[in-house]
């Protein structure tokens, strides 16, 4: 069976695969445009995106907006297919500025999690009014429960007469910061299969009343074409994958960052407590060992990039640690990774990865349903 397309209203991706936004700097225009050109949805991560701007220290908010503009334009220049998204965490201090920048640049989709993006439609309306034209950008929250999806549908409808254009449902096997309590991470009640089904049921009445589709995307631990088939059979419209795209030639991170995935063993995948107070999934290394022994201390904070960060008490600056890792300086940083990161055994091109996933999908689909 051929993989179905993924539709967000009038926008269509040929392949129902979203490359998850990965910061700091791991998914920029290089990776995002390569994924889009294979028919998927490429996503630029916005956290600390202005890191290379020479004026970042003086103007961190402006730097992030300027570089985001540059990255979106570079991606668009290199794209011949697919859709382009940006991932903007609600927890970012400059959330509004990044959102309005992305909309003004006519990005296809804004994915937003790390909190509930309750006012996202307001920014769409503001930019549309400023430009005096209707903008094409779709708004897709990232949630971890049917309850959160229901709240957003209800709030957006009552306040803005707007329904989400889709939902990404992120489960406890994802990499990076996790929207779960530590004790929920291995609880079957919070498995991705359970919460995807929960969100599908939560959005169903809203979709029926509006007489349109609200696609639900499965994310967090999705690794093979077989996984894709499983979630499509459940009623998901597509999947989001992050870890698989790190080990590609087009990934924007340093080669040392990618090799950390290739070299990882099952026991290297661990849960850490982030300085911002959330659990996170990462790969063990000497930096994290030093943190656990209390040997790390933050440098002066250039910009409080995350609202929840207490820079006075934080054992280290997570933004700087992730930036160091992106540059390949893993002695002074670490790598966020999904639960299946240890399965990565080589670096391939994005095209090779897509071809592999399509073959796996076909094999699994026909094995399960030989008709």
What are these regions (language model features)?
Residues 18, 174-217, 223-371:
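Conserved active-site-proximal phosphate/metal-binding subdomains
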Residues 1-209:
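Active-site entrance/lid segments in N-terminal catalytic domains of soluble metabolic enzymes
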């Amino acid at each position: 069976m051929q993989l179905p397309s993924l539709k967000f209203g009038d926008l269509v991706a040929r392949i129902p695969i979203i490359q998850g936004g990965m910061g700091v700097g791991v998914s920029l225009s290089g990776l995002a445009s390569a994924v889009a050109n294979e028919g998927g949805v490429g996503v630029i991560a916005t956290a600390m995106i202005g890191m290379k701007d020479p004026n970042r220290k003086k103007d961190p908010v402006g730097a992030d907006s300027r570089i985001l503009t540059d990255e979106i334009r570079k991606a668009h220049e290199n794209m011949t297919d697919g859709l382009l998204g940006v991932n903007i965490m609600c927890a970012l201090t400059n959330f509004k500025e990044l959102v309005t920048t992305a909309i003004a640049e006519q990005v296809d989709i804004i994915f937003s999690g790390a909190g509930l993006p309750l006012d996202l439609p307001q920014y769409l309306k503001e930019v549309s009014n400023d430009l005096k034209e209707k903008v094409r950008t779709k708004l897709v929250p990232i949630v971890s429960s049917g309850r959160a999806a229901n709240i957003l549908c209800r709030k957006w409808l009552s306040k803005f007469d707007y329904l989400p254009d889709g939902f990404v449902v992120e489960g406890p096997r994802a990499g990076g910061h996790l929207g779960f309590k530590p004790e929920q991470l291995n609880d079957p009640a919070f498995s991705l299969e359970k919460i995807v089904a929960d969100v599908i049921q939560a959005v169903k009445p809203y979709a029926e009343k509006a007489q349109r589709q609200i696609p639900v995307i499965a994310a967090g631990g999705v690794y093979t074409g077989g996984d894709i088939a499983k979630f499509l059979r459940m009623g998901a419209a597509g999947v989001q994958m992050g870890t698989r795209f790190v080990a590609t030639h087009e990934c924007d991170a340093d080669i040392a960052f990618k090799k950390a995935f290739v070299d990882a063993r099952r026991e290297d995948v661990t849960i850490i407590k982030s300085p911002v107070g959330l659990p996170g999934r990462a790969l063990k290394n000497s930096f994290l060992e030093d943190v656990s022994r209390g040997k790390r201390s933050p440098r002066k904070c250039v910009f409080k990039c995350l609202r929840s960060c207490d820079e006075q008490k934080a054992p280290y600056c997570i933004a700087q640690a992730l930036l160091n890792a992106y540059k390949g300086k893993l002695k002074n940083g670490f790598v966020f990774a999904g639960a299946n990161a240890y399965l990565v055994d080589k670096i391939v091109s994005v095209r090779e990865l897509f071809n592999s996933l399509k073959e796996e999908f076909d094999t699994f689909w026909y094995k399960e349903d030989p008709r």
